[in-house]
Structures are given as structure tokens and as C-alpha cells.
């Protein structure tokens, strides 16, 4: 970062000459100089080039107005105002809090001024780099000799092998030098929360509005288990969202607890809804506890916020209403909610402490922010036993954590501080809103069909749109007022074939075809439903990527309307089974799958499958104990009714468990099996469209098989 912008005076000799001298002196200090044409040009430079590390300008011409505009973009950026002996200095105490320095126009002073600007630049960089990352950078620059782990010794070992050299050249020297051992004492300890690691966690807590934060280097799957192992002791009961991530199902297998399920809603599109308000009431919980063997009043609750499809809760209401001492919001998909006003009251860390309760929030920093994969955070607000919690933390944390991951978590937090962070999140929200409007415009202008978006009819302003009762667009029956809200950065595209109420048309385009078309053109969909596709507008999505997605959608429409051959339109799919797809065209394939979906009434089947829960014969923990003792056998999926599942069975999409370990399908919940068999049949009819079902495996004959507990006797 070495770019300085100069807004020089124009045509004034006694000002021009000192600035020309200064330019030469700054270049000698290693700076690169740019000359914006005017203040508008300058602000665009700063907005789109974060490597700018200073601005020089004439105070008489631009004064505080320019400073204020720059501060709206980056209040930390050094500003250098040049004045003469007659300049008016109307600067308040508040203005002096800016990173603003004054210099006089004078010949022969350029070298000294350039040295001072180098000093101020170094202070600026030192100020924006967070503590652990700063310490890691310093350590790498020191190039110390070590005789400890890791064995590649800062990348040296890779350069002793041809293939190692390829690896080194790809990842780069600094990445490998930053992969250091816990034996480096000056970097502190992640496990003991000392030194720069502790400073990083305190820095992150301040940034995210938490009282305490913990850095986790192996994903929110692990963060969820850490919280659960601390908050739900053996023999206790916990309330848990049936929409939970599979890591929480694994927690239930590890920990000897009794789950009581909070049952969420779904709409006909297969979009995951939230848990209705009535489920959080004391009366409802009492009924659930009474109906569950071994259950007591729950000590802990787990709620997925937001849902996979981008629905956020009114978390303030839940925190006040839910009568349990410990609440965990699994917010893996929304680590940005603290940094934009539209999300106020919709995150775990929002608001003040709640008397008598401790609130946990887990976030996948890597999912929607700028952190490396596996980067995760646990935030806490309320009283808790730090020593006991840290035992749970250490139980699930490697003694060789990745320091680049730690630095990336901290840097992700640093990127969100101040006006630069607000602007980063706001840009993401605005880009998603613009994309939504563009799809609407193309739909209105297109001949025939075009894609639609799952959203209210009018989306003029950026907000979290309420899923309000009585509105048709969302498709949720009996929606609660002021309870669920659609996140604008989670964009669900709808394909023709079915409306939000589940009414199916004669013809349709299953979303899986569109997903394959986009994938073959380098555009990866986050989630695919029967007639919907989910796209995430994270902070890394720029205008080019958004336009690329729009282009992909319009290209699909054009190719579909031309009824191109599968061989030409979807060559990768064609390669799956050339004989089957040899003469098939895209409209034949679309209508074939659409008719299969209509025949089996997939939307209705999906709703019924998730609405009727299987019978819990034993807890997931008890079922797991039986499995590791070898008391299991494998049967065909179609034989599952009446047998106790040994594993979690989870079709993707939608990625939510249908059957938990220890649960049994009965005559009442038979629809779960019908739904699974229907998903399997699509792949049997059309090669390349097989459904991924976690917990079920295909044998050599193509039969899906599952593990169940052996029957007694």
C-alpha cells in the first residue's frame, strides 16, 4: 500500500513548485503518485482502490468539505492539507480528530515532509492492522531459525523437491512462513488465550458487539459442538431446531442428552421457513417435554438464524420469550448482521444482556466474509463459567492451529470496523438489491417466460422484508407478524413450473437444469430446490460477477427457447450417458423431469415429509453407542419403515435431516420414505440427476442402502 493522491493547485507558481518537489521526494520514499482530475475523481479512486494510503490537497481550494467526504469512505486515511500564510484555519476540535495534518507551501522542505508522510503512513497501516495479524507479520519478517514444527520450516523443505517447488510457487513464500508452530511464544496461545491471540479475541468481541469471542479454526461445525458440550450436560434436555445443521445432530450423538424438537415451517417451493412463535411459548414446550420419554425442562436451546434460504428471526423477541437459561443462535450464514442497520434486532449479539440468560452465537466467518475456509467465531453475552467453557473449547481444538486462519478471522473483523466496514456491507446489500431489480426488469421485458425472484412485489429500498401474515409472495401459511424477515443478500431465483402456493403448471423448467447449465459456465449455485436456486451476495461479489450471473440466466433462456440439443447445451451432462442423451433436446429433458415431479406430487410430498416427524425410539447418543458396538445391519432404503435408523439421513437439497439416529419411520411418517424414494427415482430415470442422500449409499446394482439397528432377538 504505497499510493498517495495529490489534488494539486492549478496554475499557482508558489504552490506548484513545492508540490513538484514533494512528488519527487515521495517517489524516493517508495510512494506511487496519482493525480485525480477533481474531487469527484478522487473520491472514486478512494472508493475503488483501498491501497491509497494518503491524500494531499490544497486547503484553500478544498478545505473541510473534501475531508468530510473522504471520512465517509475511510476515517482512518491520512489527509495532508497544504496552506499558505493567509489561509483561513476554521477547524473545530471535532475536525481535529480526523487524521489531518497541515503543511505550509515552502521550497526546500520536500524531503523532510516526505519523511513525515512516510511516518504517518506507517502509523496508518499500524493502526488498521489488528494485533495478532500484526504480530504474525512481524514474526515472518524476522526470519528466525526454528527447530520445531512444522516440518516444512517456512516452506524450505518444499524447495528440496520438484513437486514441492510447484507447491511452493503456487502458494507463495509468505503463506508458508506464516504457518508456524505454537512453540513461538511471542504469538501467544490460542488454547490458553494469551498474548496476541487474546488481544485478537478481545478485538473481535469489541467489533462484533460481544462480551467475549473465541476463534475456532476448524469451522462452525466445531463451534456448535463446543457450545453444546458446555451448555447441555449429560442427562439434560435441550430444545433444538429441526432445521439444524448436521454438526448439531453429531453433537446429539456425542453428548448423552434428550432432544426436544422445535418444528419449523416450509413452503411448497421447499424453502426452509422459521419456527413459528407458538413453538417458543412455555405451554408448547411443556407439551413437548411431556410427550418425550426421559425429557425434563430444557437447559439449552439451539436455533438456526438465519435459515439456509435467508430468513432471519426477531431475535430480541426470542431472547425475551424463550424460558431457558442458555440460548445458542447458529448464525453460520450471517456473520455480517452487526454491521448494517437493516439487521438490527435480528442477530444473537444484538441488544443488551438478558437477565438470567447467556446468549451464544456461532458464525462461519469464511462463508460470507473475507476469511479462509474453516474460520469460525463463537460470541458470548451473559454470565458463564470461563474455565469450564475453555475445557470444552480445548476438547475440540487442535494443539496445532493454523495461524493463517487465525489471522484471516481477525482481518475479517478488522475489515468491518468503521466507515470502510459499513460501506463494505452496504455495497453488498445494494448490489443484491440492484440484481433483484434487474431480474424483475428482464422479466417484464422478456417475450414469453423468464426467471422470477422470491421476494415481495415491491423492493424499492434495501431492508429485511417481513414475512407477514396474509401475503402470498412467501407461500408460508399462518405466518406470524414481526417474526421472520428475508435477508436481501440471499437471492432465490424461481424457475417456471410452480408458484409459491404449490400450484403446478402444465410445463416447467426444473431448477436442476439451470444449475447444471450455469455450472458448465463457471457459475456455482449455492443450493438448488425443485424450482428455485439460491445465490449468496457476499462481500466478495462484485459487479462483474453479478452481471455474469444475469448473462448466464439470459443465455439459458435463449438456449432453452431455441430447444438446443443436450449435446450442445450441456456437454458435461451429455458425457454422463451419451447413448441416453444422444438425440434429446433441452425442452424434452425439462418436461420429462417436470412430469415426473408432477406425477409424484413432489411439493406436497416434501411438505408432508418434513411435517410429520418420525418416532424417537432412543436418543441419537444411545443409537450411536449401539452402532459402535456393531449392533447394526444394512437394508434397502425401501425397507426402512419399522426399523430404527443408525445414521442421520439427510437429502441434499435441502440439506436438513429427515431422520435422526434412533428414530423410526412408522405408518404415520411413511411419507418421509416416499419422499426419499421419489428423489432416488429422478436419478434412475435421468442420468446425472442423482440426489445426494447423506446416510444412504448406492450399491453396485444402484439400490440405495441404509444402516439400521439390529432388532432384538
Which stretches of residues belong to each language-model region?
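Short, structured coil segments at secondary-structure junctions
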Residues: 29, 75, 95-98, 255-256, ...
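A short, gly/pro- and small-residue-rich
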Residues: 64-87, 378-380
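Long, structured ligand/cofactor-binding scaffold of large enzymes
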Residues: 163-254, 260
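Hydrophobic or amphipathic alpha-helical targeting/insertion segments
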Residues: 72, 80-97, 101, 109-110, ...
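Extreme N-terminal starter segment of soluble prokaryotic enzymes
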Residues: 1-3
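Short beta-alpha junction loops
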Residues: 10-12, 60-61, 82-89, 108-109, ...
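Conserved PLP-enzyme active-site core in the AAT-like
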Residues: 36-45, 58, 68, 220-440
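Non-catalytic terminal extensions of PLP-dependent enzymes
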Residues: 13-30, 39-57, 70, 76-77, ...
